[in-house]
A protein has these predicted regions:
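Short, well-ordered beta-strand segments in beta-rich or mixed alpha/beta enzyme
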Residues: 65-68, 111-122
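Generic C-terminal helix-cap and adjacent flexible tail
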Residues: 28-29, 157-159
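A solvent-exposed, acidic/Ser-Thr-rich amphipathic alpha-helical stretch
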Residues: 29-37, 51-107, 131-132
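Sequence/structural signature of outer-membrane beta-barrel proteins
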Residues: 121-123, 158-159
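Hydrophobic/aromatic beta-strand elements that line small-molecule binding cavities or substrate pockets
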Residues: 85-86, 100-105, 118-120, 135-141, ...
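Short, low-complexity N-terminal intrinsically disordered segments enriched in polar/charged residues
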Residues: 2-4, 8-60, 80
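A short, structured loop/turn motif at beta-sheet edges
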Residues: 105-112, 125-128, 140-146
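Short beta-strand edge/turn micro-motifs at domain boundaries
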Residues: 113, 133-158
Length: 159
């Protein structure tokens, strides 16, 4: 192979790589930061026990799901289940303090997922204090310029 052909192949390869990096599916730093902000908004609403703020975090779609660390069933659908889950949880737990650590954020520009851990300090109505170490996966969907939660799955780490 002569030098001219090698240069043409190299130029084609670099052009392809540059275009692939700018494709719609490539992760954009602005999307990553926006997903992290949406993720933190969820935890702010949770720790504040604020149903109105929680409503603003979720997509109002029939396919959203919520599995809390103490859930016995899967809440499917925003209007039918998820919107009702949070007021009940806030009523059952007069104290909620949750901190989140992000391990990974991934997005294709339309869907994003955040994997990490939570430490939940809870107090029940009866006064019982609970501390849960949790593995969490949160999935977000982009609607317009907002990232809205479509799935929250929190799994207690066995002791």
């Amino acid at each position: 192979m002569n030098r001219r052909n090698m240069l043409a192949i190299t130029a084609t390869l670099f052009t392809g790589l540059a275009l692939a990096g700018k494709s719609a599916g490539a992760q954009q730093p602005a999307d990553i930061e926006a997903v992290k902000a949406a993720h933190q908004s969820f935890y702010k609403a949770l720790s504040a026990r604020n149903a109105k703020a929680m409503e603003a975090v979720w997509a109002n779609k029939a396919y959203v799901i919520n599995i809390g660390p103490r859930s016995k069933t899967i809440a499917v659908g925003y209007a039918d289940a998820v919107s009702q889950y949070w007021p009940k949880a806030f009523d059952a737990l007069p104290k909620i303090a949750v901190t989140s650590t992000i391990t990974q954020v991934q997005t294709d520009g339309k869907i994003a997922w955040v994997v990490g851990t939570e430490i939940a300090n809870l107090q029940t109505k009866s006064g019982e204090s609970l501390k849960l170490d949790i593995i969490v996966t949160n999935i977000f969907e982009k609607e317009g310029d907002r990232w809205l939660m479509v799935s929250h799955h929190a799994l207690p780490i066995p002791k």
